[in-house]
Structure formats: C-alpha cells, structure tokens
Amino acid sequence: MAKKVVALIKLALPAGKANPAPPVGPALGQHGVNIMAFCKEYNAKTSDQAGMVIPVEISVFEDRSFTFVLKTPPASVLIRKAAGIEKGSAQPNNQKVGSISRDQLKEIAQTKMPDLNANDIDAAMNIVEGTARNMGVTIND
C-alpha cells in the first residue's frame, strides 16, 4: 500500500549548504522529519551546483519518512549569473543594469525547460526573456 503524504514543503536553499537552522529546521521539524538526514542528502545531491539556489519540494509521509525533488534554479538567478550582475534593476523600464546574448538566453531556457510550462525552446526563451526584461536586463541579438 502506498504511503499517505501528510505535507508538501517547498523551500529554496543554497546548493550544498543546507543546515538545521531556519528555514530548514522549523519547516521540517513541525512535521517530525529527521532534519539532519534531509540536510545530508540534499547537500550530497547539490554539491556540484555550489553557489546556486536550488528549489526543493519535500513530500512528508505519515510515518515521518520523506522524499524530495530538486527543481532547476530560478530564472532570475541564472540571468544574474549570465549578465554578471549582483541584483536586478529597481526601475527596469528606465534603468538597465546589464545585458545577455541570445545564446545565453537559449542556454538558460534549456536549463529551465523541465520546470517551465512550455512546449518548445522558443516558448521557453520568451518566458525567460520576460523575466530578464522585468529585471532590467537587455537581450542582445
């Protein structure tokens, strides 16, 4: 018989740096999950992506066991890294803070493809381009 899911927890944690301190501890602790076991497993799976923020979806079962699914890093993080900027623009319409090429945009779209609601790479590129535009990042052809 399948185990019953009692909670679905979504967190965005730095790759390879999960620890029992907030936000991990309180989120998992209230469901009775072994926090250290999660931290060790998460850090092992994300150690190759150091410096990125990796969203994770944790399913907690009634016997207090858990499984988790790693998502792709947020588009804004990938765009910031590609453009070499610290943060997006406060006024994206007036103040441009950086630029990325079409090739970089396509690369980001391919990375994000599994998590996007897009049928092909062009649709994914449009989604990522919209995010870039809202951050004050221009796309060069």
Curated annotation (Swiss-Prot):
Pfam families: Ribosomal_L11, Ribosomal_L11_N. GO terms for molecular function: large ribosomal subunit rRNA binding; structural constituent of ribosome. Keywords: Methylation, Ribonucleoprotein, Ribosomal protein, RNA-binding, rRNA-binding. InterPro entries: Ribosomal_uL11 (IPR000911), Ribosomal_uL11_bac-typ (IPR006519), Ribosomal_uL11_C (IPR020783), Ribosomal_uL11_C_sf (IPR036769), Ribosomal_uL11_CS (IPR020785), Ribosomal_uL11_N (IPR020784), Ribosomal_uL11_N_sf (IPR036796). The keyword Cytoplasm does not apply. One or more lysine residues are methylated. One of its GO terms (cellular component) is cytosolic large ribosomal subunit. GO terms for biological process: translation. Forms part of the ribosomal stalk which helps the ribosome interact with GTP-bound translation factors. Belongs to the universal ribosomal protein uL11 family. Part of the ribosomal stalk of the 50S ribosomal subunit. Interacts with L10 and the large rRNA to form the base of the stalk. L10 forms an elongated spine to which L12 dimers bind in a sequential fashion forming a multimeric L10(L12)X complex. PANTHER family: 60S RIBOSOMAL PROTEIN L12, LARGE RIBOSOMAL SUBUNIT PROTEIN UL11M. This is Large ribosomal subunit protein uL11. It comes from Crocosphaera subtropica (strain ATCC 51142 / BH68) (Cyanothece sp. (strain ATCC 51142)). The lineage of its organism: Bacteria, Bacillati, Cyanobacteriota, Cyanophyceae, Oscillatoriophycideae.
